[in-house]
Amino acid sequence: LFFPQHFFHLLSKYSNSHFGPFKSVAIIITTLAFTGCSSINSNSVAKRSAKLSTGIQKAYSVAPNTADRLSPMIIQSADKYNVDPVLLAAVIRQESSYRNSVISPAGAVGLTQVIPRYWQQTCPGDLIEEYNNINCGTYILASYNIKAGNWPKALAYYNVGPTGYNSNNKMKKQGEKYAEQVQQHQKILKGAL
């Protein structure tokens, strides 16, 4: 808010001088800058979602209606938690192959295979519901990245948990293999974009 107030103060100061004719133009530009941001961001999300959807369809043979429906959710959750949307899309490919109804033997559910008994308190709502599931999976991944300090280790944590990774060499190797698989899916998707 400082900038517009300061800007308009300067304009009013010079309104009777040779800067006066520019006041209207400056007001229009400033207004567009502040009101246009939301439409630019929404167009950006729409364009990025469309591009991601096309890539998911090509790279992973996902049906167009599924890719179109999930891509905006992936972009929005990735933006919210500062995760690369291509990485998130690759995690979904690894976890569920874009099938929402998947339930693992361990009880993990949905697209990102979240285990409700561990995450229900942190991620309220129905974790089978696509948006809730993607948002929760993204939150978990971002949290693990902060804890691990790098994405490959965060991916390993996502698969076997930090405790499993740090306490058991077999689990650590399993997590590292998982991270490599996700990174391979990420590479394939990047090539399709």
Residue spans for each PLM region:
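Substrate-binding/active-site groove segments that recognize
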Residues: 104-122, 137
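A short, structured beta-strand-centered segment in the mid-to-C-terminal lobe
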Residues: 124-133
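Sec-dependent bacterial lipoprotein signal peptides
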Residues: 3, 7-35
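Extracytoplasmic/secreted proteins, especially bacterial periplasmic and envelope-associated proteins
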Residues: 51, 69, 73-76, 86-87, ...
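Sec/Tat-exported extracytoplasmic proteins
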Residues: 59-63, 77-82, 92-102, 115-118, ...
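Acidic helix/loop microenvironments that form the catalytic cleft of cell-wall polysaccharide enzymes
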Residues: 96, 150-178
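Export/targeting segments at the very N-terminus of extracytoplasmic proteins
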Residues: 38-96
